[in-house]
Amino acid sequence: MPQTLTEKILSRASGKNVSPGDVTEIKVDLVAFHDLTGYHVIEVMEDVGTLKVFDREKLVIAFDHLAPPPDVRSAEIQGQIRNFVKKTSVPNFYDINSGILHQIMIERYANPGQVIVAADSHTSTSGAVGAFAQGLGASDVAAAVITGKTWVMVPQPFKITLEGKPARWINGKDIALKILGDFKADYFNGMSLEIFVKEPSAVPMDFRATVSNMGIEMNADALMFVPDQETFNYIKTARGYEPQMVTPDSDAKYVDEYNIDLSKLDPLVAAPHSVDNVKSVNEVEGTPVDQVFIGSCTNGRISDLEMAAKILKGKKVKTRTIVIPASYQLFKKALELGYVQTLADAGAIITYGTCGPCLGGHFGIAGPGETIISTSSRNFKGRMGSPDAKVYLSGPAVAAATALEGKITDPRRL
């Protein structure tokens, strides 16, 4: 029987053919957690009386939400996790100088056809390379760490096809917001989105990571880009080996299909206070902004920083602007390419890979009555600080243009 990518991955992981609606136990290929959720995972393991790790090579731990620790409790939590790492001899541990977990996963670990679970909702980012990646609660992740297994209800497969080439200032965020605007945030519950790209080079891995990252904002059980030449090239270049490709059968059946012509996309913005309150940038243009944030595991990659640097080169920002590359590896690359210098000369504050203001943690949280535009993933009340702040979401081009003018600006006008 023809299988979708979802069905192929979960059939392999369960050891039997599965269909949408089946509830089955599956083996996981990778498990991960970060500082904010990791100590809960460890507490669950301690409660059941074991610190056993099913395979130390398949557990990835990164400090990102509380990096560097902004308070004593955060430092204490990180100390507890470091002790766990020492006791279990887990080799894949990334301390505060490494970056955001989800970026580390796609840089170093995630492969097509894998099952990945982690204690964070944006685990879906690894779907960029064609992995079935889900965020789970601490108890389920603890069970996966101990046993190497979890359970899943096989989701309904939904096919999305991207065709055409995006215009100059269009980014993966615009693709994600287009889907959210057309379907709303609760539409894809119980579904797995499989995205096909007709011209693979038109949607680079950075764009794919952004869209996959926001799969959870679409309420999808998983979001995966079907592996293609872009996937192959990315992994071979980044890691030096040729990945094993897993793709759906050509005659596989989907619950529904949806096409996007990338050449017709305009820069989009999610207005307060919901990710699916999507508008063309022209509809909100001119809105005064107190702070701009360019970064996060959603839009803190090289192409994002490149867009911002091109817009800000030789100019000065008119409002507070914070730039945070998603990993230390990306920070060094941006430094090498001159983007850090360009952004610093423009007046931006730049730091290394950390979640920071995205979750209202530190490094620039929003104050009462302030208006923020951010390239991160969520804009509900209180997400980035004060519940009295307003957060707009956009891609890096709109964010950088806004920093330049001090008000929401269409980058095509510059």
Curated annotation (Swiss-Prot):
Pathway: Amino-acid biosynthesis; L-leucine biosynthesis; L-leucine from 3-methyl-2-oxobutanoate: step 2/4. Disulfide bonds: none annotated. Binds 1 [4Fe-4S] cluster per subunit. CDD domains: IPMI. It catalyses: (2R,3S)-3-isopropylmalate = (2S)-2-isopropylmalate. SUPFAM superfamilies: Aconitase iron-sulfur domain. InterPro entries: Acnase/IPM_dHydase_lsu_aba_1/3 (IPR015931), Acoase/IPM_deHydtase_lsu_aba (IPR001030), Aconitase_4Fe-4S_BS (IPR018136), Aconitase_4Fe-4S_dom (IPR036008), HAcnase/IPMdehydase_lsu_prok (IPR011826), Homoacnase/IPMdehydase_lsu (IPR006251), IPM_dehydratase_rel_enz (IPR050067), IPMI_cat (IPR033941). GO terms for biological process: L-leucine biosynthetic process. [4Fe-4S] cluster binds at residues 297, 355, 358. It holds the Pfam family Aconitase. It is an enzyme of class 4 (lyase). Its cofactor is [4Fe-4S] cluster. Keywords: 4Fe-4S, Amino-acid biosynthesis, Branched-chain amino acid biosynthesis, Iron, Iron-sulfur, Leucine biosynthesis, Lyase, Metal-binding. It comes from the Archaea. GO terms for molecular function: 3-isopropylmalate dehydratase activity; 4 iron, 4 sulfur cluster binding; metal ion binding. Its EC number is 4.2.1.33. Transmembrane segments: none annotated. Heterodimer of LeuC and LeuD. Belongs to the aconitase/IPM isomerase family. LeuC type 2 subfamily. Catalyzes the isomerization between 2-isopropylmalate and 3-isopropylmalate, via the formation of 2-isopropylmaleate. PANTHER family: HOMOACONITASE, MITOCHONDRIAL, HOMOACONITASE, MITOCHONDRIAL-RELATED. This is 3-isopropylmalate dehydratase large subunit. The gene is leuC.
